[in-house]
């Protein structure tokens, strides 16, 4: 297989949803149908001691939520699929955002009873901004929920995107019989003891079956006829531009409708895309020269070894283990001899990868999120990955002063993962951490104790707003007021932490010569 054929066989996507919509369960079932795992786990089964394959961190297993982005690769038919199961909790939107920079499409999971929820909307907007094609899986049809037309209308009106139902449900909850596949005109029954049924071109059953007397079946056929009479053909170009989403109905927990979705996904999802550089050069996935970028760093994937993995998306060319690459930020060459693929916390050495693949590089502190690696004589760098402005700030210290070495190592590694941000006061060197949401601090405290054996003391600093400074040379000590704290971030850039919006406006009016700015 040549490079072009290899690249065309790659499909790389992230799954996005509001917490508890069934995102991690869908991930499990996709792995199950691909043969990548023999038994699909479930995040609900905590009493059994079985946890979802993609929820590998101890705190995730205890809470039943995803707080990191898991990366898994599996083969299906003639395709190699890279799937990223993203954090569903809103406090981890920063990690999710970076993950969405590394994929070519997204799968949006919606709970049929709840419809579009806040986190779904937030992540959808990120996909829309990037023009990422979105597939929709409406989940939990075996429970009572909103009617199909109501759900489609909600998607179209709330998200401003066209919908195209690929299948249609018969009933819901206790009366859920199955789904009608529009393309094959077949009925896939929900219960295993039922056989697949066939419809003719007029949507009449070709076999005798008691379902013909069922009101749910009659209603489903009437609704489907209305959809068909609308006459809109599936527009693949609209999908690829992010203007249309194909919609699938099913129940991930019951293994139903998942394979139907997976078969359609590999048919319609895009292959790896070209990427823009800072130099405004478009790098094609078919370019012979290797390139990639780091979008995530994860410490302690193996707690026994205190390792750290940098997740790299291959953009072009072929990666070969042992090859020499240049880290563009430092302009230093390095030989990559330790590279790995993932099934959550299970790792396997990677000798070869092409555009679209996600591989892990063992990191001794060389990499930062957003780093570009290139082979040959290439000199470009990919565009920076976005960073969020924190909204909660805490002073942090070790409870036991004898644990300072472990404390600082833990801080350094967890900050480099990008889930929490680091600041230091100018004169006292007091460490202040910033986060998008409170859960990040809870996870930070949990991981410091479990992974670094350090109990930490955290104290709110009474500041809610961070503003960076364009003209640092004009900052003086008199600008450090009772309503603000002047700190340095991990890159030694000056940052003001303000008490509230009023304090920020007061500062801007009193010192108009100082140009402040925020991140995302």
UniProtKB/Swiss-Prot annotation:
<keyword id="KW-0342">GTP-binding</keyword>
<dbReference type="GO" id="GO:0016150">
    <property type="term" value="F:translation release factor activity, codon nonspecific"/>
</dbReference>
<comment type="function">
    <text>Increases the formation of ribosomal termination complexes and stimulates activities of RF-1 and RF-2. It binds guanine nucleotides and has strong preference for UGA stop codons. It may interact directly with the ribosome. The stimulation of RF-1 and RF-2 is significantly reduced by GTP and GDP, but not by GMP.</text>
</comment>
<dbReference type="InterPro" id="IPR004548">
    <property type="entry name" value="PrfC"/>
</dbReference>
<dbReference type="Pfam" id="PF22042">
    <property type="entry name" value="EF-G_D2"/>
</dbReference>
<dbReference type="InterPro" id="IPR032090">
    <property type="entry name" value="RF3_C"/>
</dbReference>
<dbReference type="InterPro" id="IPR000795">
    <property type="entry name" value="T_Tr_GTP-bd_dom"/>
</dbReference>
<feature type="binding site">
    <location>
        <begin position="17"/>
        <end position="24"/>
    </location>
    <ligand>
        <name>GTP</name>
    </ligand>
</feature>
<comment type="similarity">
    <text>Belongs to the TRAFAC class translation factor GTPase superfamily. Classic translation factor GTPase family. PrfC subfamily.</text>
</comment>
<feature type="binding site">
    <location>
        <begin position="139"/>
        <end position="142"/>
    </location>
    <ligand>
        <name>GTP</name>
    </ligand>
</feature>
<keyword id="KW-0547">Nucleotide-binding</keyword>
<feature type="domain" description="tr-type G">
    <location>
        <begin position="8"/>
        <end position="277"/>
    </location>
</feature>
<protein>
    <recommendedName>
        <fullName>Peptide chain release factor 3</fullName>
    </recommendedName>
</protein>
<dbReference type="Pfam" id="PF16658">
    <property type="entry name" value="RF3_C"/>
</dbReference>
<dbReference type="InterPro" id="IPR053905">
    <property type="entry name" value="EF-G-like_DII"/>
</dbReference>
<dbReference type="InterPro" id="IPR009000">
    <property type="entry name" value="Transl_B-barrel_sf"/>
</dbReference>
<dbReference type="GO" id="GO:0003924">
    <property type="term" value="F:GTPase activity"/>
</dbReference>
<keyword id="KW-0963">Cytoplasm</keyword>
<dbReference type="InterPro" id="IPR005225">
    <property type="entry name" value="Small_GTP-bd"/>
</dbReference>
<dbReference type="GO" id="GO:0016149">
    <property type="term" value="F:translation release factor activity, codon specific"/>
</dbReference>
<dbReference type="Pfam" id="PF00009">
    <property type="entry name" value="GTP_EFTU"/>
</dbReference>
<dbReference type="InterPro" id="IPR041732">
    <property type="entry name" value="RF3_GTP-bd"/>
</dbReference>
<dbReference type="InterPro" id="IPR027417">
    <property type="entry name" value="P-loop_NTPase"/>
</dbReference>
<dbReference type="GO" id="GO:0005525">
    <property type="term" value="F:GTP binding"/>
</dbReference>
<dbReference type="InterPro" id="IPR038467">
    <property type="entry name" value="RF3_dom_3_sf"/>
</dbReference>
<dbReference type="InterPro" id="IPR035647">
    <property type="entry name" value="EFG_III/V"/>
</dbReference>
<dbReference type="GO" id="GO:0006449">
    <property type="term" value="P:regulation of translational termination"/>
</dbReference>
<feature type="binding site">
    <location>
        <begin position="85"/>
        <end position="89"/>
    </location>
    <ligand>
        <name>GTP</name>
    </ligand>
</feature>
<dbReference type="GO" id="GO:0005829">
    <property type="term" value="C:cytosol"/>
</dbReference>
<dbReference type="InterPro" id="IPR031157">
    <property type="entry name" value="G_TR_CS"/>
</dbReference>
<keyword id="KW-0648">Protein biosynthesis</keyword>
